[in-house]
Amino acid sequence: MPRPVSVVFVSLIIAAAVGVWGVFAWNGGFEELDAIVNRHPSTGIPGLNHFPSLDQGLMSMAAFNLPVVGREPLFAEGRHFMAQLLANVFAIPIVLLTEDFRAAPGSVARYSTSWGVFSQLATSAVMCPLYGVCFSRRSNPRRVAVLPGRSTWIVLISVLIGYGAPAMLIFDPFSWGLKPQIWGVLAFTVYPLYVCLTASLLLKTVSSKRGRASRSVQKDSDSNSSLHYVVAGIVGVAGHLSYIGFHLGEHTGTAATRPDRVAQLVLRFLQIDYVITFAAMLTLAWHELTHSGRISLKPWRVAGYLLLGWLFIGPGATLAAAWALRERWIRQDTQEEKKRKL
């Protein structure tokens, strides 16, 4: 008999297929995107004119985000929503890469890059529930390994560079024009590869210096074990509160211009994707917290606190806080196990 949490994850996968992709296709979203590609058939990337099919395929990928984040015409609601979405999603690659680092060989958590690429191709609303199904089936909070060495810093720097930098570029922050913005959107599409590459380079650098810093590694790891979650929480709260502030200011300002139909369709797509994504990740957080054996609250109360966290500090910060608490318990369990062996 399937476990209740697995039923929730499978239901979210179905909801993602129907509510995200199904609604978008039903409303003619793909036809609208084809019209954008017909107006801008090329990405403008040097050399790709010799490969028109590849060029047009990449342009189709970029065309999805352009109606929301583009400057001409400027869609303020879309840009603000995308900004807070990316700020909250910052916590997800933090979690994926952290679990990748500590997972046992053969565990599905070891393939964070593959999960990230799948998320970019199929949307995070499909990936996150599927990840939750696989992760929760094998997860045992009392047998999870502590992050080795300076992995906290490696995770944080890798996500800041690999995810944060491309995420900024999609908004054309320097007003370079349409072509550079298209390149920025495409760069963000493959951000999991940048995260993986940065992490690999940092791991090699740390490994080469491990012999000289063997004594300080454990102390450094203990004192900064939740630093990456703290940063993810700050980023998520900032995005959440800025979006609330934007809406409060919108009611006191002038009426906003009505966006194009395609921009409305993409925004609706992203909103549904956003809700399902964090419903899945917070369900996974709920599972990890309630199965740790350390929490005295009833499961429904834990779910209530997670929901309140979503409303008041944002889902990204709530996810980061839940995972930081889990990290603390893992470290305490490890220390208690060491004391018993002495």
Swiss-Prot record:
Enzyme class per UniProt: isomerase
Bilayer topology annotation: Multi-pass membrane protein
UniProt entry tagged with the keyword Membrane: yes
GO cellular component entries: membrane
GO MF annotations, alphabetized: isomerase activity
Keyword Glycoprotein part of the UniProt annotation: yes
Pathway, per record: Antifungal biosynthesis
The entry's keywords: Glycoprotein, Isomerase, Membrane, Transmembrane, Transmembrane helix
Residues of this chain annotated as glycosylated in UniProt: 224
Disulfide bonds: none
Transmembrane intervals: 5-25, 81-101, 115-135, 151-171, 182-202, 229-249, 269-289, 305-325
Subcellular location(s) of the protein: Membrane
Family: Belongs to the membrane-bound ascI terpene cyclase family.
Free-text function comment from the UniProt entry: Cyclase; part of the gene cluster that mediates the biosynthesis of the tetrahydropyranyl antifungal agent restricticin that acts as an inhibitor of CYP51 and blocks the ergosterol biosynthesis. The highly reducing polyketide synthase resH, the short chain dehydrogenase resG, the cyclase resF, the FAD-dependent monooxygenase resA and the enoylreductase resD are required to generate the first stable intermediate desmethylrestrictinol.
Protein's UniProt name: Terpene cyclase resF
